Amino acid sequence: KIMDKIPFDILENEIINKGKPFLGICVGMQVLADKGFEFGEHSGFGWIGGVVNKIISEDLPSIHIGWNDIEIKKESPLLNGLETIKDFYFVHSYVFDVESEDSIVAQTNYGNNFSSVIAKDNIYGVQFHPEKSQKAGQLIFKNFMDT
């Protein structure tokens, strides 16, 4: 279990109490949830309310692999400069069903809409892989470093 392998109390103190910026990528975004169901039911960090569930689509494979656009729902420093570049690389079979619409920054459609960028205070999560997303991904990292 991931929770058994990290000094969670130290991490939580730095992120929640001291306000250090945190960026979760792919599964790193998913662990921000209250719980997830990949390989059984597991607790997450609970920093952004919601649950991680398997992708359900009648017409598409249950694993989302490849390039897809994000639809920006609200402004966020993480997405500064991305008005014209919104294509990112995804590899996942689970999605974060976010509890509060206020935490959804962008969504993506893969059979159904899912949260692809989330944020709450100093905590950010992206379902895609910025490290594989060329210029758009570089901009995400730059924006995060500038927060």
Regions found by a protein language model. Give the residues of each.
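Amide-donor transfer/coupling interface in amidating biosynthetic enzymes
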Residues: D4, E12-N17, V51-T147
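Cysteine-nucleophile active-site neighborhood
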Residues: K1-I65
